[in-house]
A protein has these predicted regions:
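FIC/Doc superfamily catalytic core
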Residues: 1-337
Length: 337
């Protein structure tokens, strides 16, 4: 004779049905599984920083060298690096604005028929923020130029920005480079990935990582590749990738400045027989801008179109510059580094 069936036996036979809401068979009774809090997130990044201490110190040293170089160099070097970095970031972000089109937009507000004006405006904003002005520490909404259209809107931007800023303040003990990496990867989670997308996150991180630098107002992240900005993995792997990519970008920036300084010295010597203000102003424009058109040079130097074209032809004939865009109204020249 079989034993009587109890209510417990009935429930045991229903093993294939899901448990009650919130039930987790891997969690011991009495313990609820929770999302990691701010303290847990910060602890992960602190452990990641400790694991990358040697590489972090090495990269910080390279940043210090770039900062010193830019402090001693002409103002135009910072502007040039900001243009190059912004153009590289645009390709990573999907806007795909080339350096020549960006130069025309920043200098003359000119865009092609097929170009996205909103994308150009985003990348132009990146140039301005990378090149100077108050950093994100002065207030994220002001830095981004984003404000709530309706102050009483649900989930206002100012509230989301404040949450992100609070987490950054909580990570004040982290090195600025680590803290910038954390901020970049928490950007979307804070609900900040709106109209500016990854461009705003990367520019904010680039300025934050520079800390109190006087020469290097931003840390290059995308020059020579955007490995530093790739998502995926735990904080330890993200920070490792961040440092590797940042070191490569810093080396690219330093090599570029080496080549630019050598070109400037060579151009001064070759152009010494020329008289007037235009040759020197044109040489300076080619230092400040990676690509220059005749209308740009006319505006930057204040010289006549004829004087600009004559000097450009003279410099091209002596191998100082070369044309990079072919025929057309906006032919572009760059220094032969």
């Amino acid at each position: 004779m079989s034993a009587p069936i109890t209510p417990d036996d009935d429930e045991a036979d229903l093993w294939f049905l899901p448990g009650p809401p919130g039930f987790d068979p891997e969690t011991p009774p009495g313990l609820d599984r929770e999302e990691p809090g701010e303290a847990d997130v910060l602890a992960e990044w602190q452990r990641a920083e400790a694991g990358q201490a040697a590489r972090l110190a090495h990269v910080a040293g390279r940043l210090g060298a770039l900062d010193d170089r830019l402090t001693r160099g002409p103002e135009g070097w910072r502007h040039r690096l900001a243009l190059i970095e912004a153009a590289e970031l645009s390709w990573f972000a999907g806007d795909r604005i080339s350096a020549d089109r960006l130069a025309l937009w920043v200098a003359l507000r000119l865009s092609g028929v097929q170009e996205d004006a909103a994308a150009l405006a985003r990348v132009g904003w990146a140039v301005r923020r990378l090149g100077g002005g108050p950093g994100p520490e002065a207030g994220l909404p002001a830095f981004l130029g984003r404000h709530d259209a309706a102050p009483d809107a649900a989930d206002p931007f100012a509230e989301r920005a404040g949450s992100w800023e609070a987490l950054m303040a909580l990570g004040a003990s982290l090195h600025p480079i680590t803290r910038a990496c954390m901020g970049f990867h928490l950007w979307a989670l804070a609900g900040l990935d709106g109209q500016g997308g990854v461009t705003e996150a990367a520019v904010t991180a680039a300025r934050s990582a520079a800390g109190a630098g006087q020469g290097a107002l931003f840390v290059p992240l995308a020059m020579g590749g955007a490995a530093a900005l790739r998502a995926g993995g735990a904080p330890a792997s993200r920070l490792k990738r961040w440092l590797e990519g940042m070191e490569g970008a810093l080396l690219t920036a330093m090599r570029h400045l080496d080549q630019l300084e050598a070109w400037d010295s060579r151009a001064r010597a070759v152009m010494s027989p020329l008289s007037g203000r235009t040759p020197g102003l044109l040489r300076a424009a080619l230092v400040d801008w990676p690509l220059v058109s005749a209308p740009m040079a006319e505006r930057l130097t204040g010289a006549s179109r004829a004087a600009v074209q004559r000097n450009l032809a003279w410099m091209e004939g002596r191998g100082l510059i070369r044309e990079v865009t072919g025929q057309g109204r906006f032919r572009m020249w760059c220094a032969v580094l």
